[in-house]
Amino acid sequence: MDVTDKFYQKSIAKLEKGATINELYELLSKYERMENYDACAGIHKAIKDKSN
């Protein structure tokens, strides 16, 4: 499992436990500032999948 998949799974789990999309956007922003773009890709994919 690569970094993107790992963060995708973690993000989906957070949403299922009651986290909001907005909380994931905050997390996305944090990883973007850290320039961890693989993590960003996973979080963004989870947001996109759950927003539809």
Features from the language model and the residues they span:
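Long, non-catalytic architectural segments outside compact domain cores
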Residues: 1-23, 52
